[in-house]
């Protein structure tokens, strides 16, 4: 588990190759995000789909032609967007080749094994760059933002959904995020400054942490007996205990305003060079 505390891309790949199946078992689906929970979205799959829907609508995918999903995971979000917006061409960029192979051939989705900081696209060639709960792993994040600026057309959007810290917080307070945030722990102010100083203007911001972390932890606690039985069929007991304790710490960190979750919609700042 040394790679859960280190920060290079190979370690992030190892992390997701190990933890992704646990998340799939716990949720019963192929989404790898925390979900956006509500009174109408009370289970993981529904909450995860809801986050993708909200993110897709924020990104105005209904009017988009070409969108890059950077750090696309198992491509479940892209499949949802493809089905919702049949005229949209999606390009799933993932440094993790094993994850790219999971989905096999898909209509209107092209899979590209590449890094987030060197996007394999021409200048001014796409109208959306999407990073749904993945940008926390991009190193350096500033290079991804610069690359997004390069490949976007003038009217394009960069849209990011990302866990953030609210105040300075030690890794010991982050719970599950010690494992899912294998890269930097960005504060909201730092993230916004990084985006605006690299040629973008933020035009929409949604802070949704209380509808992400708290209900996710509550769901696991309420259904732990069934979920742990499923997980223990494939993994040792300590894995389930780490997950359980981390979820509780994550909920506490959210309630204490140590962590939050933000969606940011950005356009190119025409005044920047």
Predicted regions and their residues:
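A short acidic, Gly/Pro-enriched loop at the edge of an enzyme's catalytic core
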Residues: 117-128
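Conserved catalytic loop of SAM-dependent methyltransferase domains
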Residues: 204-231
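N-terminal auxiliary segments of SAM/dcSAM-dependent transferases
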Residues: 1-25
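Short, glycine-/aromatic-enriched active-site segment of Class I SAM-dependent methyltransferases
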Residues: 163-183
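Short alpha-helix
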Residues: 183-199
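A short glycine-rich, Lys/Arg-flanked "PGG" loop and its adjoining helix->strand segment in the class I
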Residues: 142-157
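Conserved alpha-helix/loop element of class I SAM-dependent methyltransferases that forms part
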Residues: 45-63
